[in-house]
Structures are given as C-alpha cells and as structure tokens.
Amino acid sequence: MKKKILITGVTGFVGSHMADYILENFPNYQIYASKRYHLSRLDKIKHVYEKIKWVDCDITDPISSEKMIRFVNPNKIFHFAAESFVSPSWDHPHRYMSVNYNGTLNILEAMKKIKSNAKILIPGSGEEYGLLEKKDMPITEKTLINPVNPYAVSKVAQDYISYVYYKSFGVKAIRVRTFNHEGPRRENVFGISSYAYQIAKIEKSKSKNKNILVGHLKDKRNFTHVLDIVNAYWIATELCEVGKLYLIGNYNLKSIYTFQQALEKLKSLSKIKNLKHKIHTPFVRPTNVPFLITGKTEFEKLTGWKPKISFNQILSDTLNFWRSEV
C-alpha cells in the first residue's frame, strides 16, 4: 500500500512543483491535495491533475480542515496554502492572518485531535527578519526577527503556533524559513516574474511601449530556483529535527543580486532591444526591506543540500515560461 502525502496549496507556485518532484522521484507515495471547492485555479497542476486524489477543503474553516485530515490521515504534510504576496497584506491584513495563521492553526489542531504521527512542513519566510541593516548580514539561525509588514507578521505567527503544537502536543512540525525562490509558474506580481512576464508580453505584441513597470530595485536578495527548494523541502521532512527552526537559502555569492541587476540580466535575454523601465507607484511598498541574505545554514551543514541551478538559469527559465504563456 502506498504511503500518503497531503499537499495544501498544490495549485500554487511551490505546491505544483512539489507535486512534480514527488511524482517523479517517489512512486511509493500517493499525493492527496486540497482545493477550495470550485474556487481553486488548476492551470499550474493540470498536467498531473489525474494523478492526484483531491479533497475539497477551506483551511480557514476548522471543521473542513479536520474532515480533510481525518479522511486522508497522511504520513507527510506539505503545508503551502498561504497568502504570499507582500504588497496586498497592508490592505488585507485580516485575510493574511486568516489564511496564514488560522489556516495553519486549523491543520495543527486537526492533527492534534486525531493524534496524527505525520510530519508537517511549515514553510516560513525570510521576510520575517524584516528591517535589518547591511551589517546584520548574513542572516543566521540566531538573528532576531523584526517583521515590518502584515504578511511577515502572519508568517511569524504561523511559525510560532507550529512550535507551540510541537512543544505542547507532540505535533511533528518541521519549521523552515525560506529565502527568495523563483522560477516557472511564479505569479506575475512578484519582482523577477513580473519583469519576465512584461518582457514576454512586449516581445509578443511588438508594442512601441517598451517600458517595464517596477517597484524597489535596490533591494538585495539571494535567489534560489524553485526546483532546488522543493528538493530541500523533501530532505527537510526526512532529516530535520522536529520542532527546530532551519533556514533555507542560497549562500553562494553568485546568487546574491539586487532586483536592478536581475532586471538588467532579463533585458539582455530579450529579443527586444532598448527595453526601458520606470517606477510604478502601486509596486512601491509602504515599508521596504533592503537586505535579506542568508549565509551557510545549519540546514546545509546537517543535510549536505546545496542549490544546483544558477541564477542565470532561474532568469532564463522564468522568461521562457512566460513566453510560452502570454
């Protein structure tokens, strides 16, 4: 009999790649996935839709969440269902807390009730570290969090409640904070994916308007390909200690760039020359985070995991994805 994996948020960016990774590498597992009745968009997962067993669930509803956990009774849970775009969190803070915190709480409470022995991956965000200075880089497991947007606060709350359920009830929470990851299927509201999407549209339309709309360009991040990230997530559920916090990011100096540098590299990959860009006010955040860079982490020391895919390949893969979509 196959072991059972439950993926929440499988219709999204990371969740869909996680499903691909499991199907390609672990045929002894059956994937179960939650979807919000008729509301979930399935375009990112349509290529493997028939290989997944679907469960209707709204994770913000505790009764619905408990029914799902009881029905599936999984061996592993990858909990990706979340509101993840930072900018709208200032306008919709209740929504972010409802999905990211309450949704996680409902899953954990259901696991407690059925005495689940499953490991659950709780993916946090580098955004939780918030407003740090250049001298505070690289971020380590000992760096204090300083969240400065509602999204980051919701992820801190998600992480802390998972620790509470581990400590109080023995729920096997694998806690990770993941730094910037990009690649195909990333929604076109996020920096690099937004630039690539706009370039692909300009290429297709051959428009005279060659302006790419951008937000903050000076922010510096270390970037990891989503395929390296899902590999790290699987390894985390196999090797990481439950209850302990791990950071996942690409510490290689060749992975550290500003968004300005990423934009210029994408421009150089375009078939259209003389592309320009301009600041678009709605893309500018009320409070900005200039630096989010991790060094070599305890996760890498424990597992030996290292990202394999270069930053240039991240950009190429993202641009080619949008060329195939627009």
Role assignments for model-derived ranges:
Residues 226, 245, 282-306, 310, ...:
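Conserved C-terminal active-site "lid" loop/helix of NAD(P)H-dependent oxidoreductases
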Residues 195-201, 239-284:
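Mid/C-terminal beta-alpha module of Rossmann-like enzyme folds, strongest
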Residues 17, 25, 92, 110, ...:
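Generic structural signal for alpha-helix termini and adjacent loop/cap motifs
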Residues 43, 132-138, 160-237, 259-269:
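NAD(P)-dependent short-chain dehydrogenase/reductase
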